[in-house]
């Protein structure tokens, strides 16, 4: 029920909005005036600054934007912007081509194991990461075992070293 009411309300709102904006009064609103002449503080008439009958948004919006761009920026700046945009597009094209080439090479070498992953790392990097992780985990296990043995056997080990007259040291 709520969705139907919302749909009807949006439909009525859209129709009302379209009729208001397409009416002749709405299009000529900026040109309408209460008085024909405007006076300043001294009583002199001011020039008429009424808007055109065609508002800016009614014509071609792209041409209005181009006119504003050419009005605010000199030709040299526009040319420099164009050169920068062209160089940036070329750079992005090269980067995407390079990424595509790496992906093709990885597929050719068999590095991509499944189509669900979008990893395009080389196989050697993944392999070296795995070796490092494995070595580091072994090292951590060895350190944990040494620490455990030092805690369990620490008292007997210290006593044996002290009896021989040497310095105290753990494994």
Curated annotation (Swiss-Prot):
Important for receptor binding: annotated segments: 145-153
Keyword Cell cycle tagged: no
Main localization, broad class: secreted
Keywords on record: Amidation, Cleavage on pair of basic residues, Hormone, Secreted, Signal
One GO process term, biological-process aspect: regulation of protein localization
A Pfam family recorded for this sequence: Hormone_2
GO CC list: extracellular region; neuron projection; perikaryon
One GO molecular-function entry: type 2 vasoactive intestinal polypeptide receptor binding
Top-rank taxon: Eukaryota
Localization terms from the record: Secreted
Residues recorded with modification Lysine amide: 164
SMART domains, per the entry: GLUCA (SM00070)
Alphabetized InterPro entries for the sequence: Glucagon_GIP_secretin_VIP (IPR000532), VIP/GHRH-like (IPR046963)
Chain positions listed as propeptide in the UniProt record: 23-76, 168-171
Family designation: Belongs to the glucagon family.
Function recorded in the entry: PACAP is a neuropeptide involved in diverse array of physiological processes through activating the PACAP subfamily of class B1 G protein-coupled receptors: VIP receptor 1 (VIPR1), VIP receptor 2 (VIPR2), and PACAP type I receptor (ADCYAP1R1). Exerts neuroprotective and general cytoprotective effects due to anti-apoptotic, anti-inflammatory, and antioxidant actions.
Protein name per UniProt: Glucagon family neuropeptides
Organism this protein belongs to: Pelophylax ridibundus (Marsh frog)
């Amino acid at each position: 029920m709520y969705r139907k009411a919302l749909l009807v309300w949006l439909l009525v709102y859209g129709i009302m909005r379209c009729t208001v904006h397409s009416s002749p009064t709405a299009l000529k609103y900026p040109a309408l005036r209460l008085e024909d002449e405007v006076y300043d503080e001294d009583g002199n008439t001011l020039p008429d600054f009424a808007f055109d009958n065609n508002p800016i948004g009614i014509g071609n919006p792209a041409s209005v934007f181009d006119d504003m761009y050419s009005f605010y920026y000199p030709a040299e700046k526009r040319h420099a912007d164009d050169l920068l945009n062209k160089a940036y597009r070329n750079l992005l094209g090269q980067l995407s081509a390079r990424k595509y080439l790496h992906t093709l090479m990885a597929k050719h070498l068999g590095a991509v194991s499944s189509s669900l992953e979008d990893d395009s790392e080389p196989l050697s990097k993944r392999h070296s990461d795995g070796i490092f992780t494995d070595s580091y985990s072994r090292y951590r296990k060895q350190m944990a075992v040494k620490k455990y043995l030092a805690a369990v056997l620490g008292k007997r080990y210290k006593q044996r070293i002290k009896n021989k007259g040497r310095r105290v040291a753990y494994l």
